[in-house]
Amino acid sequence: MSHRLLFVGPPGAGKGTQAERLAANHGLLHLSTGDLLRAEVKAGSELGKEAEAVMNRGELVSDALVLAIVRSRLQSHSGGWLLDGFPRNLAQAEALDALLSELNQPLQSVLLMELDDDELVQRLLARGRADDNEEVIRHRLSVYREQTAPLINHYEQRGQLKRVVSTGTIEAVAEQITAALA
């Protein structure tokens, strides 16, 4: 499998878990913007401090920063890859389209992982991250839904969107993903 994929969905829908699994099973480069940003925060870099303040408010880190990280990883990689957590809005999707065109690595499919808000809140609280409390989580979900609706429509109109309901076991969701990408 030399897919070039996006994993899209609300925080807590299982994107990271499923992306790691798919990447490991098929030799894909897994780029999780959340993990990359948390690594910057942990390192205490200037970008990390800026990202931490934004994330603690339940807001999103700037497009320019995320796109720069993605560019640096993809330009040195010629195989299959999957992006998890980016793009989150139409402007980011258009910037990513331009980058992928420049790198001659066209996107193949977009996997939308869906789950209801109450289950998402419970999953996120169970993770125990410092930036995860119910108020911040519900705000993040609201921001996510507002910003990603046009993104989802964009990929749906291009015929690239595949939907997966991420309830059930990790294995059951993985089977749905495999079927959706077949």
UniProtKB/Swiss-Prot annotation:
Gene Ontology MF: a single term: ATP binding
Annotated positions binding AMP: 33, 38, 59-61, 85-88, 92, 129, 140
One Pfam family, short name: ADK
GO BP: AMP salvage
Keyword set includes Isomerase: no
Source organism, top-level taxon: Bacteria
A GO CC annotation given for this chain: cytoplasm
Record's keyword terms, sorted: ATP-binding, Cytoplasm, Kinase, Nucleotide biosynthesis, Nucleotide-binding, Transferase
Recorded catalytic activity of this chain's protein: AMP + ATP = 2 ADP
Disulphide-bonded residues: none
Domain notes per entry: Consists of three domains, a large central CORE domain and two small peripheral domains, NMPbind and LID, which undergo movements during catalysis. The LID domain closes over the site of phosphoryl transfer upon ATP binding. Assembling and dissambling the active center during each catalytic cycle provides an effective means to prevent ATP hydrolysis.
PANTHER family in UniProt: NUCLEOTIDE KINASE (PTHR23359)
Protein name: Adenylate kinase
Organism this protein belongs to: Synechococcus sp. (strain RCC307)
